[in-house]
Amino acid sequence: SNFSNASKENSIEMYRNSLKNLQTDYIDYYLLHSLSGIEAFNQRFGDTGIMDFLQEERKAGRIRNLGFSFHGDAAGFEKLMELHEKYHWDFVQIQLNYVDWTHASGRNANAEYLQAELDKRGIQSIIMEPLLGGRLSKVPQHIADRLKERNPQGSVASWAFRVAGTHPGVLTVLSGMTYMEHLQDNVSTYSPLVPLTEDELAFLEETAELM
């Protein structure tokens, strides 16, 4: 939930309103929105008592799985992982695609590192930005030609979705879709998913370096 700087009382009210609006007495996956490190966590959830409340809700069964989405560097992620022993993260939402795997922009941590840290602890991941904001469905022509030569039947976007779905620690992949053909392509890619081979993963790593 994106509680921002709301008070504990207002945050609890928003949470209870969510249950009411969803017409349910429990939530399967409850997410702390957009954490970048321990400072952001403490300011919004740790020092405010909100995290203690959410843990009690999970203990009572009204939250089935509790996690967070991450946007930040490796140092920030490491600090949040240190909280796993205390809070037991059930899942973490990370940005993962074949560019960000080892070529994340700015100070953002590489997806390879993030997924490996989650795997070490047995924490499932939810994948956001599998198409890097749509960039990996609208690649330069020389990249599209390279992908089509390797797999003439697959769409350009399907390569990115297969990357996101190949890793065994992935729980689900988020996809923003605008048109029916996007939905049809996604369904075709994942029904059933054909995991990428090591050779194909190496091919995509080379492709990312060409972008």
Where are the language model's segments positioned?
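Structured C-terminal cap/extension of enzyme domains
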Residues: 86-88, 113-211
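Glycine/proline-rich, positively charged
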Residues: 5-127, 131, 138-143, 151-152, ...
